[in-house]
């Protein structure tokens, strides 16, 4: 399949304009593209424009907005097939319910151009029922997409590899994003799994009385969080080897990590746990 170049796109479609879809729309508008939009919720058109208007000053301050970008270049449609007609790139962000998504995809597909790519913000690929499953690509953002650079890209055995390549070029070169390739389907993909692993241990430390909610948050913000904003855990530990490489780091420090891993907790999110964390968060809020 020959797809148009990302640079040639002057209009895209956003299907589902809740928080995630509206954020995508704000980004696409800022990068000089017009947006066809669809959402069946009453008042969705006004809500979308209001979201974009709130986001625009921040995008301008961050230098995201390109010359000629128009924050009002939104056409709202009542029919998803009309919204995607003659559009080369479609970003779908409707609620994560299989029945809703499958019904929507079936309604959209008659209007989709032969070369159109359908990117979904969903947590899994949903190709069942599509006449052209090869053009569905998972493009999972870290919220909100108009501010956080990360997009996780995933295709499976039904996906055209060229469609995934195209999405990488589109998000990076046209939208200024940072993409990673997820090589196999796992629950929550990559970034959310890393986030979940850290939060699990943070909860465990609270429940064990090791530190307060506020101090655990401080430990992340003023410690490893500063490092992680620059580079990831593998490269940090690789550099900690003194230039000798990751294998030397593991040989030297691996036994210590193994002991720490054995002591990591697996807390349950019970009502009691929720109450303890909520109380800790209220205390942290009051201290700010």
At which residue positions do the language-model features occur?
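Rossmann-fold dinucleotide-binding core
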Residues: 117-183, 188-193
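NAD(P)-dependent Rossmann-like dehydrogenase/reductase catalytic/cofactor-binding core
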Residues: 2-8, 31, 176-181, 207-208, ...
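Rossmann-like NAD(P)-binding element
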Residues: 40-43, 47, 58-117
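NAD(P)+-binding Rossmann beta1-loop-alpha1 motif at the extreme N-terminus of oxidoreductases
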Residues: 1-62, 111
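Structural motif
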Residues: 15, 38, 77, 93, ...
């Amino acid at each position: 399949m020959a797809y148009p170049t990302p640079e040639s796109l002057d209009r895209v479609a956003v299907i589902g304009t809740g928080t995630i879809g509206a954020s995508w729309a704000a980004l696409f508008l800022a990068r000089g593209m017009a947006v066809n939009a669809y959402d069946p919720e009453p008042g969705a058109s006004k809500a979308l424009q209001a979201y974009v208007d709130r986001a625009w000053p921040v995008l301008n301050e961050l230098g995201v907005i390109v010359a000629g970008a128009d924050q009002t270049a939104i056409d709202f449609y009542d029919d998803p097939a009309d919204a995607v007609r003659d559009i080369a790139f479609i970003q779908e962000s409707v609620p994560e319910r299989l029945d809703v998504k499958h019904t929507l995809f079936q309604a959209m597909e008659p209007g989709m151009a032969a070369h159109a790519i359908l990117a979904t913000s969903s947590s899994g690929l949903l190709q069942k029922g599509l006449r052209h499953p090869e053009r569905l690509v998972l493009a999972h953002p870290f919220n909100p997409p108009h501010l956080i650079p990360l997009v996780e890209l995933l295709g499976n055995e039904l996906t055209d590899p060229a469609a995934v390549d195209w999405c990488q070029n589109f998000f990076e070169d046209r939208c200024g994003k940072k993409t990673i390739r997820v090589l196999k389907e796992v629950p929550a993909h990559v970034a959310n799994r890393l986030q979940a692993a850290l939060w699990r241990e943070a909860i465990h430390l609270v429940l064990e009385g090791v530190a307060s909610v506020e101090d655990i948050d401080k430990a992340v913000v003023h410690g490893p969080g500063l490092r992680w904003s620059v580079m990831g855990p593998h490269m940090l530990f690789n550099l900690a080897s003194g230039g000798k490489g990751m294998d030397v780091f593991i040989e030297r420090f691996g036994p210590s990590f193994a002991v720490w891993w054995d002591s990591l907790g697996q807390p349950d999110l019970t009502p009691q746990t929720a109450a303890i964390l909520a109380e800790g968060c209220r205390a942290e809020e009051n201290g700010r």
